[in-house]
Amino acid sequence: MNEKYLPIKIFEKRKEYDDRKTEAGGSPDRDYSWVLHGEPLKQHMQLLTQSLSTMKERCAERKSEGKVLPVVMKTTLHAEALAKTHRKKLVDVLESDGHENVIGVYGDRQILSLVENNAILDKITDVINKEDNASVISAITDMELYEPFIERTESGCGEYRVRLLNYNDYDRNQLVKILFEQHCRQHNIKLNTATRFTSDMYIYRVTIDSADEMNFLEDFEGLYAAEETKPLALTLDALEFDEASMVRVPDPEENYPLAGVLDTGIAGISYLKPWKEAKEHTNYPVEYQNNAHGTFVAGIMEYGDELNSYKVYSTKGIRLFNAVVYPDERKEAIYPEDLVDNIREAVKRNPQVKVWNLSLGIKEECELDEFSEFGMALDNIQDENNVLIVKSAGNCANFMKGLPKSRISKSGDSVRALVVGSVAGEKELYDYAEPNTPSPFTRIGPGPANIIKPDLVFYGGNAGVDDLGNLVKHGVRSFGL
């Protein structure tokens, strides 16, 4: 969902020296050049008072319409009042009725807070009407009713992914889910799926067939955002197919580590069949599977050293748990919500597997100021099941256009996951990267809030463009189908 409209939970201390203070002495309010005084302050006080009066009117309208959820107010901060100290003062004002009203923030300038009744608006008005509070007053640009972000399809109809407001209260979050599902039934909005991404975030997928249905969706009081949803698309970037010189089989006397492969499925080829666990998990029948990608990934895990002339593996083999969580795209579409559901089910039903590989993901790059829903879902799955997911950082083709590398993909911003990027093992004609440096196609960090991602790198191939502008790639080798 568009970063402009997504809330984040990141409060980060300004790294550089705050040079917005003036050199003159005086009261703390006068230490900041953006703090208003005199007539400009009075005019701004009137503006904010009017905004709060409008909020009261909107609250009354909502109540008369029979709405049962509290109103959410959006408070916009001055562009030069983003320091932690100023935000803290503003939060104190928004919670001056003794309740934890702040539920999140929008981008880096807007705070979302609950308005249960007029009492909190009256308390805020009291603060706004005192010139002694010039710094707090000046830090506020506007206060208005929160309006959900709606990204319509070209026709207005189609499938939408819907996210509800998070009220930071279990009972209220349960209520908003019940009300939304009732709202959909009452207005004939087809509710396709409801997927739990985290303990307090569900993503719905609905079908909108008319303008009236779209209007009813927008009118729901607990709506946070709605946008067009599209199926995922899987790509095989910088990969090459090969065969090992001989089939290896497990030594019955050896105790091999076990790893789960969350992918399209591992085919029963002679090289991998001896290493596959007898038990497996699948969300799709055989006729809806295409095992090419999963087989390739499993081949790297099992025969990576031999196929790619490396000598870096510390194990003599690895037991492979096959988890088919992704279908053949030619036969069945899959949406991000489906993939999250499938991963959660596979991990939960197989507690014997503590390390999982996930080389699937989302093409879009992560944001700098908010974690992706997919990444948060992976964190939640790992927390609840006490497992580690090893996740690819993702690839991009920007190097072919002379553009900078994309940041790690959404889902690669999982804090709990071990995210792995790619480095080149060797350099051939037309290859861009020197040995042991980042591959041209690998995505890079940082992640949201400047977290370090990827966590590790491993050999993943090289690539470049020849004299005719054609892609030349020398990827990692594994088994093809």
Where are these regions (language model features)?
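Acidic-leg catalytic submotif of subtilisin-like serine proteases
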Residues: 244-285, 295, 300, 454-456, ...
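Autoinhibitory propeptides
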Residues: 1-61, 80-250
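Active-site-proximal beta-strand/loop segments in catalytic clefts of secreted hydrolases
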Residues: 262-265, 324-326, 358-362, 392-395, ...
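Flexible, small-residue-rich helix->loop connector segments that border functional cores
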Residues: 262-269, 298-317, 344-349
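Substrate-binding/access-modulating region of protease and related hydrolase catalytic domains
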Residues: 175, 326-416
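Short helix-loop-beta-strand segments that form the rim/entrance of peptidase-like active sites
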Residues: 301, 308-331, 354-356
